[in-house]
């Protein structure tokens, strides 16, 4: 791979930028290089109080940063990539691309459309009498064609795609003997009304379940089992959609390959070693449950998480964010073309971001809105195309994208739902 930096030009990953400029500033050890990698400048200070950091700007927006470790070695940050580069030449030549104008013309007229199902969860809350509400779920449908947004719909429950069609996931609470038990109901969407609830034994304890992630073939949940619920869920599970109410989730050998398993165990041990004596006292570190695994959102991606179980199962336990991403078995699309840091510099404080596979729009979650932004030349256009109102405590548990002919097919499921926003923008 070759990267070229000129006085006003840049070429990286076959991407070309014209009329760029540079800005130099001195940064200290606490300067964040990458939120995704949890990396600050501290690693590269080498005894220095400050390091000269050079920002690459395009249309007054930072598109990359770099600093020199030596005369011939550079650390280069571009989008979500952090690269160590070695100088190969001081002479930079940019070849003329005769097809550049034709490619731009093609991109301007290329017909593209995408759609996304966004699954939202309203977590249970404590009522005035000390009881807890039931969690609620709904699915948003957002689509566009050449940046023209279609109707934005909402329907109850989690509506999600599988190879066999569009499916419906709902949660109901079974109450008997004074105990509550959350159960999932999964069916093909058009068979939803015909599906009967599963027959189970009478409840002998409370079981509360909360969805963290929904994919095509698996969901991830957190769970509480007991009679003194305080809003804590110490148990994590990954469950197959085909048998979603089983007692045990996927085991460690079913989730990770051998190298990932070693990495996971090491990260868990490192987490334990970083805890104070007081923190360790409340955890069951003598008998680690390595199968206590889930998937949830962090920094714009779906990631594996684990939890060290507490000795008192009414408590929360200690969460461990793993540096391992789910493979295609769990999620088809899990990329983030724009770094969290760049978005933070551009938009300030936000909760989450979902960038379309065609890299044309971004859905940014704020406290009370999911704002839809257009993407041009790798940059988010500051004025949103539209803002979808959501509740402040709603959490995203699913984002399933489609393009082309599937947009119309998926939308058919939603056209009898609630119209959140029409297309008169």
Model-derived regions, located:
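Repeated scaffold domains used in trafficking and secretory/extracellular systems
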Residues: 63-64, 155-168, 199-212, 259-265, ...
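Hydrophilic extracytoplasmic domains
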Residues: 318-425
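Short, solvent-exposed loop/hinge segments that bridge or flank secondary-structure elements
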Residues: 1-9, 56, 126-142
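Short coil/turn segments that connect the beta-strands within blades of beta-propeller domains
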Residues: 71-72, 113-115, 215-217, 358-360
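Edge beta-strand at a domain terminus
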Residues: 19-31, 71, 75-101
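Contiguous, well-ordered beta-strand patches that form the walls/edges
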Residues: 5-66, 192
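Acidic, serine/threonine- and glycine-rich low-complexity intrinsically disordered segments
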Residues: 199-349
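Tryptophan-anchored aromatic micro-motifs
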Residues: 1, 104-106, 113-116
């Amino acid at each position: 791979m070759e990267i070229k930096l000129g006085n006003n030009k840049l070429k990286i990953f076959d991407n070309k930028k014209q009329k760029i400029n540079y800005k130099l500033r001195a940064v200290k050890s606490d300067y964040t290089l990458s939120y995704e990698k949890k990396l600050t400048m501290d690693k590269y200070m080498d005894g220095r109080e400050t390091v000269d950091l050079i920002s690459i700007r395009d249309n007054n927006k930072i598109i990359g940063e770099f600093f020199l470790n030596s005369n011939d070695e550079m650390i280069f940050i571009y989008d979500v990539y952090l690269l160590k580069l070695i100088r190969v030449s001081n002479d930079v030549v940019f070849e003329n691309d005769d097809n550049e104008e034709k490619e731009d013309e093609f991109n301007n007229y290329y017909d593209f459309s995408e759609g996304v199902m966004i699954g939202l969860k309203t977590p249970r809350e404590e009522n005035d009498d000390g009881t807890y509400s039931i969690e609620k779920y709904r699915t948003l449908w957002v689509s566009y064609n050449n940046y023209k947004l279609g109707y934005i719909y909402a329907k109850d429950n989690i509506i999600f795609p599988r190879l066999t069609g569009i499916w419906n996931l709902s949660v109901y609470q079974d109450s008997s003997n004074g105990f509550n038990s959350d159960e999932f109901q999964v069916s093909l969407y058009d068979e939803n009304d015909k599906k009967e609830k599963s027959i189970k034994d009478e409840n002998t304890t409370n079981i509360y379940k909360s969805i963290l992630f929904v994919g095509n073939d698996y969901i991830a949940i957190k769970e509480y089992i007991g009679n003194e619920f305080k809003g804590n869920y110490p148990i994590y599970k990954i469950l197959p959609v085909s048998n979603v109410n089983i007692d045990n989730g996927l085991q460690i050998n079913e989730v990770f390959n051998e190298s990932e398993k070693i990495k996971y165990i090491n990260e868990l041990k490192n987490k334990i070693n970083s805890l104070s004596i007081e923190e360790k006292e409340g955890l069951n570190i003598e008998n680690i449950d390595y199968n206590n695994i889930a998937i949830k959102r962090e920094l714009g991606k779906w990631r594996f998480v684990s939890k060290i179980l507490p000795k008192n199962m009414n408590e929360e336990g200690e969460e461990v964010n793993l540096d391992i991403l789910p493979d295609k078995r769990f999620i088809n699309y899990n990329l983030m073309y724009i770094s969290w840091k760049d978005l933070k510099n551009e938009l300030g404080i936000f909760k989450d971001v979902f960038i379309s596979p065609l890299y044309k729009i971004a859905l940014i979650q704020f406290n009370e809105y999911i704002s839809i932004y257009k993407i041009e030349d790798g940059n988010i256009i500051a004025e949103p195309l539209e803002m979808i109102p959501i509740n402040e405590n709603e959490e995203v548990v699913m984002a399933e994208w489609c393009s082309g002919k599937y947009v119309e097919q998926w939308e058919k499921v939603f056209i009898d739902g609630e119209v959140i926003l029409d297309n008169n923008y």
